[in-house]
């Protein structure tokens, strides 16, 4: 399996003490500027993009999980024939599911308040191979729907 982990780009959104969005690029504390939505300049945007794609590869992680699970849905056990595996994986016939979703980590009090905490939480827990599994599209929808239903019931009972 790959030693690289995935971190979604949105994990790097940063805010100053006043709650204003500041540039996501590491070490930059400037306020974002139009026309950019997450950066202060084109240079910062390009630097961050290069760093992000060099260090974090979601496609690679997904591929590792699909291979580990032998291109088989871990719930219904539907197995994709070898000749179709790459095609189905690419067309999203298979999906990589987070067993413990990000929203639950936040509810449990895990910290995403600094860049270091975001990277640590994401790489060590959220996108750890033990927290990922291969599901077919239908099973992934069912799992997500059930999680949302249980979450809604829990929220109502509080």
Which residues make up each language-model segment?
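Short Cys/His-centered divalent metal-binding micro-motifs
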Residues: 44-45, 78-82, 125-154
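BZIP DNA-binding basic region
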Residues: 1-7, 12-49
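Short, charged surface segments at domain edges that flank catalytic/cofactor-binding sites
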Residues: 9-16, 43-78, 123-126, 130
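Short Cys/His-rich "knuckle" micro-motifs
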Residues: 31-39, 48, 52, 82-97, ...
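Short beta-strand-alpha-helix junction that forms the catalytic/metal-binding core
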Residues: 73, 105-139
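Short cysteine-rich loop/turn motifs with clustered Cys
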Residues: 24-28, 59-106, 136-138
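Terminal non-domain segments
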Residues: 67, 108-111, 123, 153-157
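Short metal-coordination and nucleic-acid-contact micro-motifs, chiefly zinc-binding Cys/His arrays
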Residues: 16-24, 36-37, 68-70, 92, ...
């Amino acid at each position: 399996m790959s030693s690289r982990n995935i971190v979604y780009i949105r994990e790097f959104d940063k805010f100053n003490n006043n709650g204003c969005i500041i540039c996501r690029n590491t070490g930059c504390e400037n306020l974002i500027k139009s026309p950019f939505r997450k950066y202060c300049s084109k240079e910062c945007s390009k630097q961050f993009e290069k760093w992000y794609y060099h260090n974090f590869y979601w496609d690679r992680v997904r591929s590792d999980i699909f291979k580990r699970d032998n291109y088989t849905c871990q719930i219904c056990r539907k197995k994709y024939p070898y000749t179709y595996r790459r095609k189905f994986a690419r067309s999203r016939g298979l999906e990589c599911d987070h067993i413990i979703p990000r929203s639950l980590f936040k509810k449990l009090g895990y910290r995403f308040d600094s860049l270091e905490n975001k990277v640590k939480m994401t790489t060590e827990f959220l996108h750890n191979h033990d927290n990922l599994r291969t599901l077919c599209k239908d099973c992934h929808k069912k799992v997500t729907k059930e999680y949302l239903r249980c979450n809604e019931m829990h929220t109502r009972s509080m």
